[in-house]
């Protein structure tokens, strides 16, 4: 691979750290804002160079950046995430935690100091977040959430659902679908348990 300039290395490092933290790639505007570029064109130019030099691959979709292995390197550093059943992207369904398989995930993107599991999505309530029925979502285990996170939420200890999280006040939480045809779910905070945050998506084509 061709050597990178200092700025190109900084952009690449930002993309890596952003993906590790959020589970998806930054947008051009995220890059522009972080580096105080005057226009999206400057950020786009850096992505073109990184792709030409073989460090990333881009798809013609929003946030469509994929990290490429360095020359001579393969993704040998992997960890296994158990497939722990299914999750509702629709009405909440009874939580199922039987491990049926394991999915390898590269530690290049997902730090080893966390635990992960995956769930098969059922339903279309998150379709506008590009999460389709049949997809597998990769979940980082944690018992807390920030506004805007997509989480696995357990309601009343039995029913699990995949929704976007929003804290209304000390007593109530809103679970928001990414589908305009579906209703939000308002839940008492003490009736809700966060099981993890979505950090990745796996789709079998």
Swiss-Prot record:
Kindly indicate whether the keyword ATP-binding belongs to this entry: no
> Which GO molecular function terms does the record list?
sequence-specific DNA binding; serine-type endopeptidase activity
Output the Gene Ontology cellular-component terms.
protein-DNA complex
Q: Which GO terms describe its biological process?
A: DNA repair; DNA replication; negative regulation of DNA-templated transcription; proteolysis; SOS response
Q: Does the keyword Transcription regulation apply?
A: yes
Report the CDD domains cross-referenced here.
S24_LexA-like
Return the EC number.
3.4.21.88
Keyword terms, alphabetized: Autocatalytic cleavage, DNA damage, DNA repair, DNA replication, DNA-binding, Hydrolase, Repressor, SOS response, Transcription, Transcription regulation
Give any Pfam family that matches: Peptidase_S24
The reaction(s) this protein catalyses:
Hydrolysis of Ala-|-Gly bond in repressor LexA
> What exactly does this protein do?
Represses a number of genes involved in the response to DNA damage (SOS response), including recA and lexA. In the presence of single-stranded DNA, RecA interacts with LexA causing an autocatalytic cleavage which disrupts the DNA-binding part of LexA, leading to derepression of the SOS regulon and eventually DNA repair.
Task: Tell me the NCBIfam families matching this sequence.
Answer: lexA
Partners and quaternary state? Answer: Homodimer.
Identify this protein by name.
LexA repressor
């Amino acid at each position: 691979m061709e050597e990178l300039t200092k700025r190109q290395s900084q952009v690449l490092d930002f993309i890596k750290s952003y993906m590790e933290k959020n589970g998806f790639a930054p947008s051009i505007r995220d890059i522009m804002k972080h580096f105080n570029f005057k226009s999206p064109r400057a950020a786009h130019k850096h992505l073109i160079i990184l792709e030409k030099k073989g460090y990333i691959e881009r798809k013609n979709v929003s946030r469509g950046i994929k990290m490429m292995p360095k020359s001579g390197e393969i993704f040998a550093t992997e960890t296994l995430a158990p497939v722990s059943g299914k999750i509702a992207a629709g009405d909440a369904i009874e939580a199922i935690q039987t491990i049926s398989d394991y999915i390898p995930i590269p530690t290049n993107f997902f730090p080893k100091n966390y635990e992960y599991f995956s769930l098969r999505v059922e339903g279309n309530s998150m379709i506008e977040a590009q999460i389709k029925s049949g997809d597998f979502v990769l979940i980082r285990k944690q018992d807390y959430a920030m506004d805007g996170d997509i989480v696995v939420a357990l309601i009343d200890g039995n029913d699990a659902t995949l929704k976007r999280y929003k804290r209304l006040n000390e007593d109530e939480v809103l679970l928001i679908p990414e589908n305009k045809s579906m209703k939000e779910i308002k839940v008492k905070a003490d009736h809700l348990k966060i099981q993890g945050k979505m950090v990745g998506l796996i789709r079998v084509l």
